[in-house]
Amino acid sequence: MTGKYMPRTVILGVIGSDAHVVGITILEQALSAAGFEVINLGVQTAQDEFVSAAKSHDAEAVLVSSLYGHARQDCEGLHDELDDAGLDVLTYVGGNLAVGQSDFEETQATFRQMGFDRVFDAETDPEEAIEMLREDLQLTTTEAEQIRVDG
């Protein structure tokens, strides 16, 4: 990278026993194209793997995907583990988060209460999530543009 801005590091993975890989592959490509350094943990990722990766890569955000409807069970306690490790990172969760999910606002509220900064459904455009990530990381327009140019 030739510019003065370093890419922001994000951890990405599919939590729990979920083996859906397509969504995180699309997210990884979109985030990389937007200039982020992406550490993709892949599928069937345990909470401690997210925590370990965030710590070892000095990540600024942990992005959790789940499409099989059991995200609540899989994510329970994740923020306690992040806190115990002394990490202060943004956390996003997205996908088909609950079996039979009919009221996404209720699902959002549940995950916000669990400590997630942003909650997305499976229909969210990756660019929307990236724009929110830039906003939450307080990237200036100049920095975001530089990341895109140099990335």
UniProtKB/Swiss-Prot annotation:
<feature type="domain" description="B12-binding">
    <location>
        <begin position="7"/>
        <end position="140"/>
    </location>
</feature>
<feature type="binding site" description="axial binding residue">
    <location>
        <position position="20"/>
    </location>
    <ligand>
        <name>adenosylcob(III)alamin</name>
    </ligand>
</feature>
<feature type="binding site">
    <location>
        <begin position="96"/>
        <end position="100"/>
    </location>
    <ligand>
        <name>adenosylcob(III)alamin</name>
    </ligand>
</feature>
<dbReference type="InterPro" id="IPR006394">
    <property type="entry name" value="GlmS"/>
</dbReference>
<dbReference type="GO" id="GO:0019553">
    <property type="term" value="P:glutamate catabolic process via L-citramalate"/>
</dbReference>
<comment type="subunit">
    <text>Heterotetramer composed of 2 epsilon subunits (GlmE) and 2 sigma subunits (GlmS). GlmE exists as a homodimer and GlmS as a monomer.</text>
</comment>
<comment type="similarity">
    <text>Belongs to the methylaspartate mutase GlmS subunit family.</text>
</comment>
<comment type="function">
    <text>Catalyzes the carbon skeleton rearrangement of L-glutamate to L-threo-3-methylaspartate ((2S,3S)-3-methylaspartate).</text>
</comment>
<dbReference type="Pfam" id="PF02310">
    <property type="entry name" value="B12-binding"/>
</dbReference>
<dbReference type="GO" id="GO:0019670">
    <property type="term" value="P:anaerobic glutamate catabolic process"/>
</dbReference>
<keyword id="KW-0479">Metal-binding</keyword>
<dbReference type="GO" id="GO:0031419">
    <property type="term" value="F:cobalamin binding"/>
</dbReference>
<comment type="pathway">
    <text>Amino-acid degradation; L-glutamate degradation via mesaconate pathway; acetate and pyruvate from L-glutamate: step 1/4.</text>
</comment>
<feature type="binding site">
    <location>
        <begin position="17"/>
        <end position="21"/>
    </location>
    <ligand>
        <name>adenosylcob(III)alamin</name>
    </ligand>
</feature>
<feature type="binding site">
    <location>
        <begin position="65"/>
        <end position="67"/>
    </location>
    <ligand>
        <name>adenosylcob(III)alamin</name>
    </ligand>
</feature>
<dbReference type="InterPro" id="IPR006158">
    <property type="entry name" value="Cobalamin-bd"/>
</dbReference>
<protein>
    <recommendedName>
        <fullName>Glutamate mutase sigma subunit 1</fullName>
        <ecNumber>5.4.99.1</ecNumber>
    </recommendedName>
</protein>
<dbReference type="InterPro" id="IPR036724">
    <property type="entry name" value="Cobalamin-bd_sf"/>
</dbReference>
<keyword id="KW-0846">Cobalamin</keyword>
<keyword id="KW-0170">Cobalt</keyword>
<keyword id="KW-0413">Isomerase</keyword>
<dbReference type="GO" id="GO:0046872">
    <property type="term" value="F:metal ion binding"/>
</dbReference>
<dbReference type="GO" id="GO:0050097">
    <property type="term" value="F:methylaspartate mutase activity"/>
</dbReference>
